[in-house]
Curated annotation (Swiss-Prot):
It catalyses: 3-(3-hydroxyphenyl)propanoate + NADH + O2 + H(+) = 3-(2,3-dihydroxyphenyl)propanoate + NAD(+) + H2O; (2E)-3-(3-hydroxyphenyl)prop-2-enoate + NADH + O2 + H(+) = (2E)-3-(2,3-dihydroxyphenyl)prop-2-enoate + NAD(+) + H2O. This is 3-(3-hydroxy-phenyl)propionate/3-hydroxycinnamic acid hydroxylase. Disulfide bonds: none annotated. PANTHER family: 3-(3-HYDROXY-PHENYL)PROPIONATE/3-HYDROXYCINNAMIC ACID HYDROXYLASE, FAD-BINDING MONOOXYGENASE. The gene is mhpA. One of its GO terms (molecular function) is 3-(3-hydroxyphenyl)propionate hydroxylase activity. FAD binds at residues 8-37, 275-285.
Length: 562
């Protein structure tokens, strides 16, 4: 085996998290090597739901237009009781982050687009059919020993990220715990081609006799999931006749369905004791496992990649100190834990097999649906934990105000610029830091010293205005992009907060916010908390990709203002 020599980052695992992370790093000029034990991508669906945050991440790496054809946007999820009476419905209407909150998707096709995206980068490589054997850390980095069909090899890197799944070898070598529970309940998942039902949405049957799920994906694929009883074996659950009987209540001719795959699985609720140990980090299923009920296993992994990617790139390129990577665990652990707890709780609500318990549950849910605020809480998925970082790579004013937007994701409305109408905001912000002011010039507010330092870090400077002022050119600054508030969403945001100057991280989290006059102090605080340095690059090739896209037109999911 030819040794790949030295790279900046080694990623173990070519699943969706590893591929997304590699695209983020590749776009920032970071030399990256993926080591994958399999010979090719997995060709069957695992995850079936994408949320708005994942699509926003794919937008940031320039691949969302390639991915959208493999999705079903605005997918409704309905919950039924044993008599097929509607208990609850999830149909979130807003797209505050630029994309629908619920989307069905075909994972193998999306993963293939993520892999194809790496072809854009000469400095990113995937080694298939190679197993990571050992990791040795020293003062300068890590040495990864790899085995394969043509012999061993070693590669030296600054960091290793384990994206190698629930049985992560990276986590094992780190000596990190993976505490939690594994459910004793088993389920069989059946993926069908040529969808025998054909309708576009999904349902969960909270039937105590046998809870089930029926999920429309894309390209004519439907997934059924059924609970397996204690007296039924795994072998039974994979028998074609047994599967046909499971499908019979839903499909007129279950013996004629086109089965792509069927398998038995259990639900895990686990989280790693640490997401970082020295120069080794974990992401995705290697860091956390959760039940399927909120469709957040896949999406939580993509959040990991987006959170970690920009930080790794900044450290490798010498723009930030190594301590920035400590904020990855501080930020992602709490949110991943909240998602695990929510998914576990929803599973318990859906799957009681005791009829009296199920009847009581049905009464409680129907009673709650009478109350408009509770009904909207479910309909609009307001129960979904949103990232809100109280510590990490964020600066909170002291004392912090309850309404402060710091540590939350910034909205992504459609905006106008002098050059282009009706574009998603992130396509104007670029892929790095951004300083965004309402109705002010960022250079004037920051002062020349802070402005110059942010500019050296590749930041984009945005002056947001009402659309009526878009083409007012007095005091124009060539380093500042003027954005017209096409929909009024930006004005509404700033109207709801006292802060009028925002510093946005590359993952679009609000790193800091304050009133206009305190912008210089805000910058000084953030340079310290984010461990940002002047200068940098340290051998990385530098940012090489920025692909603004007319994305929402192709999705048809975000309303266009005329």
């Amino acid at each position: 085996m030819n040794s790949p020599g030295a790279v900046d980052v080694v990623i173990v695992g070519a699943g969706p998290v590893g591929l997304t992370l590699a695209n983020i790093l590749g776009g920032q000029g970071v030399r990256t090597l993926i080591i994958e034990e399999r010979e090719t991508l997995i060709d069957y669906p695992r995850g079936v739901g994408l949320d708005d945050e994942s699509l926003r991440t794919f937008q940031s790496i320039g691949l969302v237009d390639a991915i959208l054809p493999h999705t079903v946007p605005n997918q409704i999820l309905r919950f039924y009781d044993a008599n097929r009476r509607l208990l609850a419905e999830m149909a979130p209407p807003d797209a505050r982050f630029g994309w629908p909150k619920r989307n069905g998707f075909v994972q193998p096709m999306v993963d293939a687009e993520l892999l194809a995206g790496l072809d854009r980068f000469d400095h990113v490589e995937v080694m298939w059919g190679r197993r990571m054997q050992t990791i040795a850390e020293d003062a300068d980095g890590v040495t990864v020993e790899v085995s394969g069909p043509d012999g061993p090899a070693s590669v030296h890197a600054q960091y290793v990220v384990g994206c190698d799944g629930g049985r992560s070898a990276t986590r094992h070598l780190m000596g990190v715990s993976f505490d939690g529970t594994t459910s004793s309940t088993r389920w069989v998942v059946i993926d069908l081609a040529n969808d025998p039902l054909g309708h576009p949405n999904s349902e969960v049957g909270a039937d105590p006799q046998r809870p089930y799920a029926s999920i429309s994906i894309a390209h004519g694929i439907r997934r059924f999931e059924f609970m397996i009883h204690a007296d039924e074996t795994d072998e039974q659950a994979e028998d074609p006749e047994f599967v046909a009987e499971l499908l019979r209540p839903f499909v007129p001719h279950p013996d004629r369905v086109d089965v792509i795959r069927r398998r038995v699985y259990t639900h895990h609720s686990r989280i790693a004791g640490s997401f970082r140990k020295g120069r080794m980090l974990l992401a995705g299923d290697a860091a956390h496992l959760m039940p399927v009920w909120q469709g957040q296993g896949y999406n939580s992994g993509i959040r990991d990649a987006f959170n970690l990617g920009w930080k790794l790139a900044a450290v490798v390129r010498g723009q930030a100190g190594d301590a920035l990577l400590d904020t990855y665990d501080a930020e992602r652990r709490k949110h991943a834990r909240a998602m695990i707890d929510l998914s576990t709780m929803v599973g318990r609500v859906i799957s009681p097999t005791n009829r009296k318990v199920a009847a009581l549950r049905d009464k409680l849910i129907r009673g709650a649906s009478i109350v408009p605020t509770l009904k909207r809480y479910v309909l609009e998925m307001r129960f979904k934990p949103m990232p809100r970082y109280h510590e990490g790579a964020v600066y909170h004013a002291k004392p912090p105000t309850p309404a402060s937007p710091v540590g939350t994701l910034f909205i992504q409305p459609r905006v106008d610029t002098r050059e282009q109408d009706n574009v998603l905001l992130d396509d104007v912000l670029g892929t790095g830091f951004a300083v965004l002011c309402w109705n002010n010039n960022p250079r004037t507010l920051l002062g020349e010293a802070a402005f110059t330092r942010w500019k050296a870090l590749g930041a984009t400077f945005i002056a947001a205005r009402p659309s009526t002022q878009l083409h007012w050119t007095k005091d124009d600054d060539p380093d500042v992009v003027i954005v017209g508030d096409r929909t009024g969403a930006l004005k509404a945001f700033f109207d709801a907060h006292t802060e009028s100057v925002l510093v946005l991280r590359p993952d679009r989290c609000i790193a800091g916010a304050d009133i206009a006059q305190r912008a210089p102090e805000l910058s000084t605080a953030l340079f310290g908390i984010l461990h940002l340095r002047q200068g940098g690059e340290n051998g990385a090739t530098g940012p090489v990709l920025y692909v603004p896209q007319p994305t929402a037109e192709s999705s048809g999911t975000v309303g266009r203002a005329s």
